[in-house]
Amino acid sequence: MKSIFLVFFAVCLVKAEAGKGRKREPNIINPPCRECYVQDSSGNCVYDKWGCGGARKREPNIINPPCRECYVQDSSGNCVYDKWGCGGARKREPNIINPPCRECYVQDSSGNCVYDKWGCGGARKREPNIINPPCRECYVQDSSGNCVYHKWGCGGARK
């Protein structure tokens, strides 16, 4: 029994030593598609009903984009790795909020934030004091009245 254990232990040590010299590759998921999706020949994520239970289950709502965490869908529909969304060294600017108006405001056709009384209770409530500028947190109103992202007001590194 001891000899079997010693042989097993020796084999494990040899395998461990052999694996030490290998170069570690980053954790790139290939394909980068979510569960129930596979990557086709052109790199797009397509739904794989057989990988998700086939005819026994209904096809779930299609996830758009169907990319896994840490991936974003580019303009051609491919899932590409987004290192900043996955703990990259620099902090990314947040996704731009569109429209960037505060609660009770909507963006008109020219991009200005205007008060929407119906979105805030309509005739039942008084119109609150107008917030000037009516932009959300991290946004400021420029000279033409549009809300633009202000990275310094959102924790950006100061000079």
From Swiss-Prot:
Protein keywords: Cleavage on pair of basic residues, Disulfide bond, Nematocyst, Secreted, Signal
Chain positions listed as propeptide in the UniProt record: 19-26, 59-60, 93-94, 127-128
Subcellular location(s) per record: Secreted; Nematocyst
The keyword Coiled coil is assigned to this record: no
Family the UniProt entry places it in: Belongs to the sea anemone BBH family.
Function (record text): Inhibits ion channels.
Name recorded for this polypeptide: U-actitoxin-Avd13a/b
Biological source species: Anemonia viridis (Snakelocks anemone)
